[in-house]
């Protein structure tokens, strides 16, 4: 199925996404979207008949077993902290002074 990227498609996508683009942004999006679709069309042209489908590209996951461990004690947790006060980490203010 060939998708035609034109002004109508861009306007339709604008309406679906509830955004408003300037004329310049519409032209940029139209060009970028056309390039993306061309790329996927090239991928679709590949002959993959001799390629066995994979469920996952890695033979097994990299997850470790969820084994309970002793937590860090306060002294080790605060050892490399720049600012601490009364046994707590002092972070930067995020609101007000």
Curated annotation (Swiss-Prot):
Q: What is its EC number?
A: 6.3.5.-
A single GO BP term for this record reads: translation
Kindly state which keywords UniProt assigns to this record, in alphabetical order.
ATP-binding, Ligase, Nucleotide-binding, Protein biosynthesis
Q: Name one GO molecular function term.
A: glutaminyl-tRNA synthase (glutamine-hydrolyzing) activity
Instruction: Return the Gene3D superfamilies for the record.
Output: Glu-tRNAGln amidotransferase C subunit, N-terminal domain
Assembly and oligomerization: Heterotrimer of A, B and C subunits.
Q: What does this protein do?
A: Allows the formation of correctly charged Asn-tRNA(Asn) or Gln-tRNA(Gln) through the transamidation of misacylated Asp-tRNA(Asn) or Glu-tRNA(Gln) in organisms which lack either or both of asparaginyl-tRNA or glutaminyl-tRNA synthetases. The reaction takes place in the presence of glutamine and ATP through an activated phospho-Asp-tRNA(Asn) or phospho-Glu-tRNA(Gln).
**Hey, which family's this protein in?**
Belongs to the GatC family.
Q: What is this protein called?
A: Glutamyl-tRNA(Gln) amidotransferase subunit C
């Amino acid at each position: 199925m060939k998708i035609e990227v034109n002004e109508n498609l861009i306007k339709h996508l604008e309406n679906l996404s509830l955004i408003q683009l300037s004329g310049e942004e519409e032209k940029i999006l139209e060009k970028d979207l056309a390039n993306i679709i061309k790329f996927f069309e090239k991928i679709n042209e590949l002959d993959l008949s001799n390629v066995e489908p994979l469920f996952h590209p890695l033979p097994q996951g990299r997850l470790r077993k969820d084994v309970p461990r002793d937590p860090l004690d306060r002294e080790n947790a605060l050892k490399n902290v720049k600012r601490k006060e009364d046994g707590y980490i002092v972070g930067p203010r995020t609101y007000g002074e």
